[in-house]
Curated annotation (Swiss-Prot):
Transmembrane segments: none annotated. A motif ('HIGH' region) lies at residues 107-117. Its main location: cytoplasm. GO terms for molecular function: ATP binding; glutamate-tRNA ligase activity. Its EC number is 6.1.1.17. This is Glutamate--tRNA ligase. It is found in: Cytoplasm. Keywords: Aminoacyl-tRNA synthetase, ATP-binding, Cytoplasm, Ligase, Nucleotide-binding, Protein biosynthesis. Gene3D superfamilies: 2.40.240.100, HUPs, Ribosomal Protein L25, Chain P. Pfam families: tRNA-synt_1c (PF00749), tRNA-synt_1c_C (PF03950), tRNA-synt_1c_C2 (PF20974). GO terms for biological process: glutamyl-tRNA aminoacylation. CDD domains: GluRS_non_core (cd09287).
Length: 573
């Protein structure tokens, strides 16, 4: 038994180490018995041992857990380092030194985090971990007018990243750093590398497109500083003055020519700073300053934002800084799923969607609500990798990855959609004992009792099988012959118990329940949300957030458990 205890301790420590210090007894049991099938016959004595060891491990600090794991199983850390690049398939980073890589993810908290954003976030985090570096979460919230941040999204984004398995080393919020941006803006003005433009926007655009300098561009530094102070003091109104970075007026892309760095927003009503500040940096200026200030070494950026680097390099060159290594990748989308924050917001406001976690959406919260595991999302992003071309994945791709992860952990139950009563003649009382999971008998069984004077319920989806003269097998119960179908239900007659009879005759198998509990399953179908009403096994032991398999229906996540009804959300087949 001591050898088994050592084995359990090893798996408990590994599970705790990879799950922020909290080992899961079920996961440890599954690992012990799954990789040592000869122990399954001793499951009853091993389960209490696992619970005891897991409690001991969970009482240790993270540092104590790691030290103990290194003591009894140092190979884990060697294998872990070897597998990082092999398993995940990410190529080496250019100019990357172990322990010195710093990456960042800079979302705008104006909406929920979605699968499209996840590409840059996951790549940034994976490489930071691969090189034992640092991962920074930086909220880009300096546009209180067009992309207005909302307090809830700061928390949601952080929660979503942590759910995805991120270890966030630092968190910075751009709106807390306005004074820093002001200092750098003033330095650039004093250096003659930036100026305050008071041209009407249309006039500047006309000059820019012709490659002609704005009349304020070469005015003395003293004049520029005076205008700058007026911007800060509120003497200019919104749209009357802009700080611009001097660039090449003949650059082939007009948007790069003397691009705007800071502008005025009257009454910003920012959720963090209120109306304290009126001068706000635009993305490229704030990002350039922060990437330097925070020591970012590598940036992962969508191909559509490649021009940002061109703009920001002017700031870096003027200060003599080295620009971070930039890795561009294509956009990621999923067939039939909306990722656009503006379209999602509009749909929510119009009542089309239930919220940011509506299971039809592609937000991380929606995917989580639907039963997609964080490991599946990470694996998908890593599989796509650093391709520069845009990538559209099908739901089936994500489902296939998720299925591998949840199949071993999902207990099985019968759910009968659109139930129809079936009255079986000639059968005696019988209790079917069905494994919660066919591959893990140690989890126990469900018991469904058939009583001759009560009907069983079968699904309307199987109506084509219920024709007089047909034979079907009620799964894990017995075989019946269909005698009659009418408006009151189905009349059938007991034929035999043996599964072999059904198999030899190729009779179809259907699932069933007796007196089940009311259950509805929400099934996302493109832009539609179909609600399937039905019955779930009356003794089904399900809790909110459980992921289970409704046999012959699909994998679902339990969304709500009420006294009168269970609500589940369909994930995939």
């Amino acid at each position: 038994m001591e050898e088994i205890r050592e084995l359990v301790l090893k798996y408990a420590l590994i599970n705790a180490y990879t799950h922020r210090g909290k080992a899961n007894p079920k996961a440890v049991i599954g690992k012990v018995l799954g990789e040592n099938p000869e122990l399954r016959k001793r499951a009853k004595e091993i389960i209490p041992l696992v619970n005891e060891v897991v409690n001991e491990v969970n009482s240790l600090s993270l540092e104590e857990q790691e030290a103990k794991l290194r003591e009894i199983y140092p190979e884990f850390f060697e294998e872990k380092n070897e597998k990082k690049e092999e398993k995940k398939g990410l190529p080496p980073l250019p100019k990357a030194e172990r322990g010195k890589v710093v990456t960042r993810f800079a979302p705008n908290p104006d909406g929920a985090f979605h699968l499209g954003n996840a590409r840059a976030a996951i790549l940034s985090h994976e490489y930071a971990r691969m090189y034992d570096g640092k991962f920074i979460l930086r909220f880009d919230d300096t546009d209180p007018k067009v992309k207005r941040p909302e307090p809830i999204f700061y928390e949601w984004i952080k929660e979503d990243l942590e759910w995805l398995g991120f270890r966030i080393d630092e968190i910075h919020i751009a709106s807390d750093r306005l004074e820093i941006y002001y200092d750098y803006a003033e330095k650039l003005i004093k250096m003659g590398k930036a100026y305050v433009c008071t041209c009407p926007p249309e006039k500047f655009r006309e000059l820019r497109d012709k490659g002609i300098a704005c009349p304020h561009r070469e005015e003395p530094v003293e004049v520029q500083l005076e205008r700058w102070r007026k911007m800060l003091n509120g003497e200019y109104r919104e749209g009357e003055a802009v700080v611009r970075i001097k660039t090449d007026l003949n650059h082939p892309n007009p948007a790069v020519r003397d691009w705007p760095a800071l502008r005025i927003i009257d009454n910003p009503n920012h959720p963090r700073t209120g109306n304290k500040y009126r001068v706000w940096p635009l993305y490229n200026f704030a990002s350039a300053i922060d990437d330097h200030e925070l020591g970012v070494t590598h940036i992962f950026r969508g191909q559509e934002h490649a021009e940002n680097e061109t703009r920001q390099r002017y700031v870096y060159e003027y200060f003599g800084w080295e620009y971070p290594v930039t890795v561009h990748h294509g956009r990621l989308s999923i067939e039939g799923v909306i990722l656009s924050k503006s379209k999602t917001r509009k749909g929510i406001e119009e009542g089309k969607y239930l919220g940011w976690d509506d299971p039809r959406l592609g937000t991380i919260r929606a995917l989580r609500r639907r039963g997609i595991k964080p490991e599946a999302i990470r694996e998908l992003i890593i599989e796509v990798g650093l391709k520069r071309s845009d990538t559209t994945i099908s739901w089936d791709n994500l489902a296939a990855i998720n299925r591998k992860i949840i199949e071993p952990i999902a207990n099985r139950y019968f759910f009968v959609a659109d139930p129809i009563p079936m009255y079986v003649e000639g059968a005696q009382e019988f209790t079917a004992e069905i494994p919660l999971h066919p591959d893990y008998p140690e989890r126990g069984v469900r018991r469904l009792k058939f009583e001759p004077d009560k009907p069983v319920y079968v699904s309307k989806d199987d109506m084509e099988l219920f024709k007089p003269g047909n034979f079907v097998r009620l799964k894990d119960l017995f075989n019946v012959e269909i005698m009659e179908v009418n408006e009151n239900g189905i009349r059938a007659r007991f034929h035999s118990f043996e599964y072999e009879v059904a198999r030899e005759n190729r009779w179809r198998m259907v699932h069933w329940v007796t007196e089940g509990k009311a259950c509805e399953v929400w099934v996302p179908e493109g832009d539609e949300l179909i609600i399937r009403e039905g019955l779930l096994e009356s003794d089904a032991d399900v809790k909110v957030d459980d992921i289970v398999q409704f046999e012959r229906f699909g994998f679902v996540r339990i969304d709500d458990v009420r006294p009168e009804k269970v609500v589940a959300i369909f994930a995939h087949k």
